[in-house]
């Protein structure tokens, strides 16, 4: 376990890989075009997929957690050993978690100097664990309740949470595979803690248009927040994007069609996958603000061979990274 660093050192160290964009301020583009890596890693023996990625940069290295599946469709979770460059992901060790944290979200909660790993399918609808060393896959605390509510008209129940904070509040966003995105909130002074049982619908559309894998970010240098949501299209999974001026505000569609998505087959530049699915934008720093640099957007995502088919929980998902063209 590494010695604990100060809050300032930890937060600043997370910006190392993106420091080149610090001097400039960019707006989000009106249309997106990306380049893509090939698949960056193969699951180790016993796993059929690596999926549902969450990523922070700390001490100049990527820390990536993910869900796993096996040949029977059973879920688990894992973490890669920290690595500096995406090209190193294939050789990074893959470390199974002894207690699963499926569809994870990792971040550093600066006000309490603690790392948070939020996830689903734990003791409550959403749960969280804490740690002083996020690189240790099995160094997390016992599970604590993050959200205990339920939703109607959903075959999955609450799914695919993300957590983000501003100066005064923490917010929980999640999906339900039912065309709705939900939000709950609490005072930042009470976090980490339980968001309770109540939530509100902040977006509503068809199931295919608002399916799952919601993520929310602060846009660096702008009074703006960015939400991305996975959708089901005719050519595969893709992300739609929305913006808002505050985390408690209304969301407006930004890049919302399959032919002009935030990220999808139409604009990903990927040749190995038609699907751009559950992932995480690379953040400026690892803290609860989830800040991204619009001058240097990268998306860690899950993709799969276009010829693969069968039960969703047995599909061979792999990690890839999109880099925004500038």
UniProtKB/Swiss-Prot annotation:
Chief location bin: secreted
Name by which UniProt lists this protein: Probable alpha-L-arabinofuranosidase axhA
Record EC number: 3.2.1.55
PANTHER family linked: ALPHA-L-ARABINOFURANOSIDASE AXHA-2-RELATED
InterPro entries in the record: GH62_arabinosidase (IPR005193), Glyco_hydro_beta-prop_sf (IPR023296)
Glycosylation sites recorded in the entry for this protein: 307
Role according to the record: Alpha-L-arabinofuranosidase involved in the hydrolysis of xylan, a major structural heterogeneous polysaccharide found in plant biomass representing the second most abundant polysaccharide in the biosphere, after cellulose. Releases L-arabinose from arabinoxylan.
Organism of this sequence: Aspergillus terreus (strain NIH 2624 / FGSC A1156)
SUPFAM superfamilies: Arabinanase/levansucrase/invertase
Keyword presence, Secreted: yes
GO biological process: L-arabinose metabolic process; xylan catabolic process
Pfam family, one: Glyco_hydro_62
């Amino acid at each position: 376990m590494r010695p604990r660093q100060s809050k300032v050192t930890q937060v600043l160290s997370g910006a190392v890989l993106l420091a080149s964009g610090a001097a400039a301020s960019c707006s989000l583009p009106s249309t997106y075009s990306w380049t893509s890596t090939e698949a960056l890693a193969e699951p180790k023996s016993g796993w059929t997929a690596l999926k549902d990625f969450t990523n922070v940069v700390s001490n100049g290295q990527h820390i990536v957690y993910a869900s796993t599946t096996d040949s029977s469709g059973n879920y688990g979770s894992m973490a890669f050993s920290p690595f500096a460059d995406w090209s190193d992901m294939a050789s990074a060790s893959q470390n199974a978690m002894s207690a699963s944290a499926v569809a994870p979200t990792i971040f550093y909660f600066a006000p309490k100097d603690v790392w948070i790993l939020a996830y689903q399918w734990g003791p409550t609808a959403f749960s969280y664990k804490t740690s002083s060393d996020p690189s240790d896959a099995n160094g997390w605390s016992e599970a604590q309740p993050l959200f205990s509510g339920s939703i109607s008209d959903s075959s999955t129940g609450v799914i695919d949470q993300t957590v983000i904070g501003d100066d005064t509040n923490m917010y929980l966003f999640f999906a339900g595979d039912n065309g709705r995105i939900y939000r709950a909130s609490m005072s930042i002074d009470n976090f980490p803690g339980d968001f309770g049982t109540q939530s509100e619908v902040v977006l509503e559309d068809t199931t295919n248009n608002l399916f799952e894998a919601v993520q929310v970010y602060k846009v660096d240098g702008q009074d703006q927040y960015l939400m991305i949501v996975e959708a089901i299209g005719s050519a595969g999974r893709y992300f739609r994007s929305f913006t808002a001026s505050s985390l408690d505000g209304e969301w407006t569609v930004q890049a919302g069609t399959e032919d002009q998505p935030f990220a999808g087959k139409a604009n990903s530049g990927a040749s190995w996958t038609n699907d751009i699915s559950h992932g995480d934008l690379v953040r400026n720093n690892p803290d609860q603000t989830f800040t991204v640099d619009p001058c240097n957007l990268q998306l860690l995502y899950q993709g799969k061979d276009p010829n693969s088919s069968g039960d969703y929980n047995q599909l061979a998902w792999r990690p890839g990274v999109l880099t925004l063209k500038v």
